[in-house]
Amino acid sequence: MPPNARVSYGAEKYLPREIDNHGIVGNMHTSAMISLDGSVEMMCWPNFDSPSIFARILDARAGHFSITPIEQTSCKQMYEPSTNILHTKFYSERGVLRLLDFFHRPWEDYEPLYPWLIRRVSCIRGTSRIKLECFPALDYARQSHETRVSKITENYYQAEFVPASGDPKYILDCVPSGDQLKIDLELIYPAEHLIEGGGVISYLELEEGQEITFIFRQEGLGPNVDYVTPNLVDKLEDSTKRYWRAWIQQCVYTGRYREFVQRNALTLKLLIYEPTGAVIASPTFSLPEDLGGVRNWDYRFTWIRDSAFTIYALAQLGFRAEAVEYMSFIYHVLKKKNKDGGINIVYSIHGDSQNLEEVELTHLRGYYNSHPVRIGNAAVHHLQLDIYGELMDSIYIYDKKCQPIAYDLWLEVRQICDYVCANWKRPDKSIWEVRGQERNFLYSKIMLWVALDRALRIAFTRSLPCPKHMVWMDTRDEIYEAIMDSGYNMEKGFFAQSFENNDILDASVLVMPLVSFISPTDPRFLSTMDNIMKPLEKDGLMSNGLIFRYNNFVYEDGVGGDEGAFTMVCFWLVEALAMAGCSGYPKLLSTAVSMFEDLVRYSSHLQYYSEECSLSSESLGNSPQAFSSIAAIAAAHILDKALSIFNEI
């Protein structure tokens, strides 16, 4: 299909690209999802959890910002090495066009942040004709606006998008490099049922060496600039390149999978909200886990579980500053514990629980009619006891890899451990956030054991005062024995999903050796892995080399619908196999290598992952997803160590 057929502003039946045919750029405040066609298909503004301005991937009426060749072209997308600057190239017989997308990042501390989406278009061979379309749809396409076009100078145009509420005003700057390139902006008001408030289009012909920059910004946000010069754009691009290259140079991983690990680390960095140090699960919302299905969630918040794993991964790679910032965020969360002494499972990026209520946007069709489209997340009301394990593991790694924790944080840790001791027997919703009945999920019990184990390690290593250390030790051991006694199905030979569902297999138990709960070569665990690796049709969880969380046809989680294989647990299996492989089972190491290499091929063309993957290799769910990149990094790290032990190349 020609690109211009896909991106017409009047296309009521617009067909978005596949989820994995997008790149992402960001500035640690927000991000933009950009398709291989050169279209901004999702962007929330000015923060990750703000309402969307562009969200056409969910509905043709939800706004877009496209820069697309008019001729039939082939296209390729890549990041500039060691940066999060996205290159999209369009190739035709007439010429080659390059589209450069980035958000500015200041390199020097004294530089201000220009919170702009910058899109630079240049013709690098021959001639190219392009079409610009900018049609915002404010507040998830719920608020109308007025579009105005101004001619600032002979060759400088500016479009303004003024919300019905009057504030804030959004600006599109058109900045040509040189006077030879002539531009014009045409004001368009399509039918009301598409984009209420209109937008702008422009047709341009670029010759070799010509360049034009389009900048989307908000009036009053960032430095005050009346109009943008090409020289300023050059400086912002150079500063952004320097920032990303300096950041990734801190990475201490130098193993076999260096490029893969660094790209996923760069992706994780984009998911950090810089003002607070919070880490979001994903910058997108309501991308489906099953095409046409109902499993469509909003992940633009900071889950304690996801963010703790993220900081664990970044700290292991040598990125200490992010761990320090996150620990500051966590300390403030712990200072505001609930009345019962616990904490919430999810917070806003600002550290509170506001604007998290789940709402269905019934006016949006959803990605390929996958509805409802949801914002907010009802999981905020869940009890998910496993979060205390992930939290304590991240604090333990922080204390070990970054800097010793402060005494005031230790006091908060003690209170958390007391809460764990008092509540570990309660059923919960656990890691999969089921919307059915609460259970005594094994994953939660394992992570509650981790919480007490890591706290005890910190106490003994640092000689920190621990008045209830005997209670913690006794409870830790009691949890362990409960898991081994009630969580293992002796007849079928696997660790089960929960104490109640003792005959149901769940891939979350693969975490056991990863958190040092059990030896990777313990017969019970090896038998569990064997069962998980059986085909779905033979009561296992594997299909086409991919692992499902659990069998939806056997276990009803209260959500309904189907889903794809879960990327994170696929990598957990690689880790577990590699650990067993270097502990006396070399064939399992070979299996781990083969599976890892297959999983690398399941990544997007930019080497990051969505939450899930279909059996036909399509990405499903929100993308990029922190969980998936974290697990990919950890698997590469463990596999590299295991291969080094066996001196394999």
Curated annotation (Swiss-Prot):
Gene3D superfamilies: 1.50.10.10. The chain crosses the membrane at residues 265-285, 564-584, 626-646. One of its GO terms (molecular function) is hydrolase activity, hydrolyzing O-glycosyl compounds. The keyword Membrane applies. One of its GO terms (cellular component) is membrane. Its main location: membrane. One of its GO terms (biological process) is carbohydrate metabolic process. It is a multi-pass membrane protein. Keywords: Membrane, Transmembrane, Transmembrane helix. It is found in: Membrane. The keyword Transmembrane helix applies. This is Uncharacterized protein C4H3.03c.
